[in-house]
Amino acid sequence: MEDKQKIISKDYIQKALDERIERIKKYDTRYLQMIKEEALLIDTEGFVVGQVNGLTVIKIGDYSFGKPARITASTYMGKEGIINIEREIEMSGPSHSKGVLILTGYLGEQFAQDMPLSLTANLCFEQLYGGVDGDSASSTEAYAMLSSLSGIPINQSIAVTGSINQKGYIQPIGGVNEKIEGFYQTCKLRGFNGDQGVIIPVQNVRNLHLSDEIIDAVRKNKFHVYAVSTIDEGIEILTGVPAGKKDRNGKFPLGTINYLAHEKLKKFSGITNK
């Protein structure tokens, strides 16, 4: 029977808003279904070299939701520097392109004080068929690069968000709650293993407003939220290997991530610049 009530109450308005959200949420559900069917390739366990789970936010009107995105890096001898594949095919916005250029500055200051930075590296948002903008994935791209250069694999149970500056410090980003929720739902779909979680900028801790379900999972150590302030802190969480800090002679400790990356770049430079 049709409701002929003339006065629109608060309950009617709330019902209409809730139904609108449910209609829009079908896109969120569809992404999870694609991950379940492996139409979207996302790992939530295991270790892989040069591959990191990034976190993105999709907006539809005034509704937004987060989803993970696979980001990969391949590094090899050459002089082309860092190639942003999205930029090459005109799918990268200015903020994302700026983030990649900042990453070049970080690598140069960190590893090229005693030699030219001689490498070619490809960075890619896998299975991206629309545009990408924003610099919130620049830390994720840095971790993928360090993993590729050092040969040390990244823990796929962890997803990452955060931008970086040329000094290697992590900077705050937007949409932190949606991003955490997106990866949490993906891990829930696949099954929790006790290691899964996200790395966020320490500045975004004040912005956290997570669901009771996620808070409960964190309390039970089913899911983790790590807050970091530097690339070195993040890479240690992702690999379990010390990052390594330079001594007074500019040398990294043997066996650390930065030592291995520097040695690879030194090899590239020696061969490329003969």
Residue ranges and their predicted role:
Residues 1-8, 21-24:
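AAA+ ATPase "lid" subdomain C-terminal helix
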Residues 7-11, 15:
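Terminal amphipathic helices with adjacent charged low-complexity linkers/tails
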Residues 16-20, 238:
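A general structural motif at alpha-helix termini
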Residues 59-63:
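SsDNA-processing nucleotidyl-transfer enzymes
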